[in-house]
């Protein structure tokens, strides 16, 4: 010691910046999905689903779902010689079959020496959580599944109030509902909800938005969490599915859900399925029925062929509104080499409604290489002017005109590319240093007008004492296509 602890909050964003120990499980042993459980020297826990290749883009860490929570137990103690941790993880929190080989790895973060260690070696250019480099846990006998893994959580809420000043009558209200989770088998799970109560869900972290782009908050509602990557892991910049579009309006206010059913998991070792249906309540606006189907078929060693179909249909006065619908479909191929160095993606999708039948496409292309020293990645994506997706929150698609009080939907093409080179000197105070060049931007599909762009050249030195020297030259521009104001009281900025 002393040992570094950045936060005592569970699942903190700064958890991995301090001393920590973690174990990774891949019970299916296909190197495409896993779960990580971590603890620091003060016994603070974190856990997450690993839903892809861990990476950073735009300062955001991707490939993890930290909203996934399970009940497990840890104890940690600090002594003169170091610190120790004891972990007890109930296997009922994992989905596994009768396989006697699991993927596993152990990670140790030594913050004082700015070093990460893993039991199964991982090349230095990758995160220690990369599933392509897991070791093997071999069971003499595979662990037994719990015969009955069913949880049922009913609730009853009531309130009463009276205005004594105005001598009003006593007003009372009651609400009842339930949530259920049923393990169909060791790899397939059924979630059910009736009139769900999401009042226990963590509130969104308040953020100030001074941009023209809507903020994207993480999903925290339990019903939508398990195996959420089956539905959401499509695309890069423009993703065709975002579960917070169901049961929440654009301002985060609740739209009551009448019921929901969700089947997700592995049908076999190579095929994952997600099937969901939910119904929202009719209020001032018609209710909606949302249906989603997503399939992930593993091909080659670590590659995945994926497809999705989403359907929204309006309901009013107990009947379907035939002219109020939105249907989304698409296919995607995601290639990853066994050693994780090469990666490629290609996807195409269409959106249908009763009004728009052309310029309703979305596409995504990505390719790159990540070696020990040299890395390069290029991503090009785009969508048409009539790609209207009620299941998605796509940045820079909607543009608000503060003068006309009108929102315009525009198709755009997006590019993002990065290239870098790292050096690993053998001396006493530098871990690594290197440069990177990054560019990204968006232009409208029809008129090729610039929406935004950013170009940056960076040189970074990482010291062994955890210090960092970062020299960056960046040029960033935003083109207002329509007048914009930060608040309702501001004078709009001209386009």
Regions found by a protein language model. Give the residues of each.
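Exposed, low-structure sequence patches enriched in small/polar residues
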Residues: 256-258, 264, 339, 343-495
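Residue-level detector of the transmembrane beta-barrel scaffold of outer-membrane proteins
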Residues: 86, 103, 151-155, 189-193, ...
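Outer-membrane beta-barrel translocator domains and adjoining extracellular loop/strand segments
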Residues: 50-52, 117-119, 164-169, 204-207, ...
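Membrane-embedded beta-strand positions in outer-membrane beta-barrel channels/transporters
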Residues: 20-22, 84-86, 151-155, 177-178, ...
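Beta-propeller domains
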Residues: 282-365, 384
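Structural preference for beta-rich elements and adjacent junctions enriched in aromatics
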Residues: 1-298, 306-307
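Short loop/turn motifs that connect adjacent beta-strands in outer-membrane beta-barrel proteins
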Residues: 94-100, 142-150, 187, 270, ...
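Transmembrane beta-strands of outer-membrane beta-barrel pores
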Residues: 41, 91, 108-110, 158-162, ...
């Amino acid at each position: 010691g002393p040992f570094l602890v950045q936060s005592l909050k569970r699942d903190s964003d700064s958890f991995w910046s301090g001393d920590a120990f973690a174990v990774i499980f891949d019970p299916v042993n296909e190197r495409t999905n896993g779960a990580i459980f971590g603890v620091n020297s003060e016994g603070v826990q974190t856990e997450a689903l690993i839903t892809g290749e861990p990476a950073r883009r735009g300062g955001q860490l991707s490939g993890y779902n930290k909203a996934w929570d399970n009940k497990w137990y840890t104890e940690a103690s600090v002594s003169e010689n170091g610190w120790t941790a004891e972990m007890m993880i109930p296997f009922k929190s994992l989905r596994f079959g009768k396989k006697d080989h699991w993927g596993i790895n152990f990670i140790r973060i030594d913050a004082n020496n700015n070093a990460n260690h893993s039991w199964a070696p991982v090349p230095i250019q990758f995160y220690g959580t990369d599933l392509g480099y897991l070791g093997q846990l071999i069971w003499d006998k595979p662990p037994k599944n719990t015969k009955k893994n069913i949880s049922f959580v009913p609730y009853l809420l009531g309130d009463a109030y009276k205005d004594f000043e105005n001598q009003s009558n006593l007003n009372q209200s009651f609400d009842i509902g339930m949530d259920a989770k049923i393990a169909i088998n060791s790899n397939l799970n059924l979630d059910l909800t009736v009139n769900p109560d999401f009042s226990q869900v963590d509130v969104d972290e308040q953020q100030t938005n001074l941009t023209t782009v809507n903020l994207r908050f993480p999903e925290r509602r339990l019903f939508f969490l398990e195996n959420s990557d089956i539905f959401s892991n499509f695309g890069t910049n423009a993703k065709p599915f975002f579960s917070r579009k169901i049961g929440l309006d654009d301002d985060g206010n609740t739209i009551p859900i009448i019921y929901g059913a969700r089947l997700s998991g592995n049908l076999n070792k190579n095929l994952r399925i997600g099937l969901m249906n939910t119904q929202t309540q009719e209020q001032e606006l018609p209710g909606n029925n949302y249906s989603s189907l997503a399939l992930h078929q593993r091909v080659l060693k670590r590659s995945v062929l994926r497809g999705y179909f989403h359907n929204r249909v309006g309901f009013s006065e107990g009947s379907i509104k035939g002219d109020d619908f939105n249907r989304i479909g698409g296919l995607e191929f995601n290639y990853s080499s066994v050693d994780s160095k090469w990666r490629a993606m290609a996807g195409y999708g269409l959106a249908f409604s009763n009004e728009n039948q052309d310029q309703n496409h979305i596409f995504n292309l990505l390719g790159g290489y990540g070696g020990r020293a040299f890395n390069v990645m290029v991503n090009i994506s785009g969508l048409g002017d009539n790609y209207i997706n009620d299941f998605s929150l796509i940045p820079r698609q909607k543009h608000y005109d503060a003068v006309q009080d009108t929102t315009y939907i525009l198709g755009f093409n997006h590019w993002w590319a990065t290239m870098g080179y790292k050096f690993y000197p053998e001396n006493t105070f530098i871990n690594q240093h290197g440069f990177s060049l990054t560019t990204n931007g968006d232009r409208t599909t029809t008129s090729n007008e610039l929406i935004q762009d950013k170009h940056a050249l960076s040189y970074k030195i990482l010291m062994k004492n955890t210090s960092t020297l970062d020299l960056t030259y960046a040029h960033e521009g935003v083109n207002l296509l329509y007048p914009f104001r930060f608040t309702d009281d501001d004078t709009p900025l001209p386009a």
